[in-house]
Amino acid sequence: LQRRVPRANLYQTNFINREYCNYGRDFRECYLLFGGSSNERIYFANQVLNSHDSFDISFSEKVEFSYENFECKHANKLFFSHHSFDCVESYYLIDCRNCMNCFGCVGLVNKQYYIFNQPYTKEEYEKFIVSNDTGSFENHKENLAKLQKLNLTMPHRYARIYKSVNSDGDDLFEARNTHNSFSSLLTEDSKYLFYCKNGVKDCYDTSFQGFNSELLYEIAHGFGGSNGAFGIRNFNNQDSRYNEECHDCVNLFGCEGLRKKQYCILNKQYSKEEYENVKNKIIKDMMERGEYGEFFPIKLSPFAYNETIAQEYFPLTKEESLSKNYEWKDDENRNYKIDIKTENIPDKIQEINENILNKVIACEHEGGCKEQCTEAFKIVPEELKFYKRMNLSLPRLCPNCRHFQRIRQRNPLKLWHRTCMCEKENHFHGAGKCEVEFETSYAPERPEIIYCEKCYQQEIY
């Protein structure tokens, strides 16, 4: 049935003058953007909402004139940052809030004119920005190295959970009774969620779902719906099981690509009584074979393992994939004629002219990574204009490899039980080490300093 029923080649709603975009709505003049809504002139990005004039951003919202951001919100001219909100005209920030004119900072709140977490006058800060020259790639590498070194000296909150009650996971906003979940907003009484937004209630094992969804189980991508299980890309369905790409339907079982239908099994129409009888027989047979209650088997995936986002979060080699009987797509023999290698690119963006637009640039990884490296890439005109306008160095990696560098800034989608590392006597626990326990996405062997909520608040605010 999956092979016979036509599928939409792309999921695009109200797209205007876009190239290489999918899974979104209201995109205007965007390029290589996957996932999101209400975006204009967003390039090389994924899962972006209500943003414009930005490049290389992921899982971000209300961002403008920014570059290389991950999990950032309400930002203007924010560059090379992650998990930072309400920040303006700043560079290299980690876990900062409401900051302006800050450079290379970690864990700051309500600050201005800070450089690597140290305060400066306005004049000193502006002089530093000029002397540092953000358009230099060598300076960029040095700044990143300094930021990572600083990051290991600063305490980190055990989890990025905001305005939430009785919830655990990471990157949660306004969650209530939500557990072992990640990158989600406005969720309630749910567990094992990933990137679920705007009204998800009583849902388990669900990803990329949102907008008033309830009583869902084992769902991969969709909007709305109630009492559904084992589905892919379904919108506003009710009382349904094992369906794919069905919209506005009720009482479906094992259907593909239906619209506004009711009482269908394997795309065949039944009466209400027939539907219940046949459905129950199928469920009984599936249960006897141990199949009912499980998601679609991976052999039904239309894509190879390394073509999906599974490779982003659970990377495998070809040998590992094949040993698990997963399909694998071999790299294409691209035979690019490389015009320029990264070591031959001028260091400063202002030294680069428009001739670069005609060049095939070798990716610095040269295909030797697990990041779907394209081995070479080109700079598009709008991209070069942006780099020059913002004085940012030319990238040395292809868009795919840049994407993988960004998502590495996310902690694993997994929790460990740990104890607060704080030993400061002036905190609420007094002398000795804090004994507060919590669930955190920071693995025990990681080098970061992890604090409980109270110790973190006392240290940062």
What are the roles of these predicted feature ranges?
Residues L1-Y461:
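Long, distal/terminal scaffolding or interaction modules
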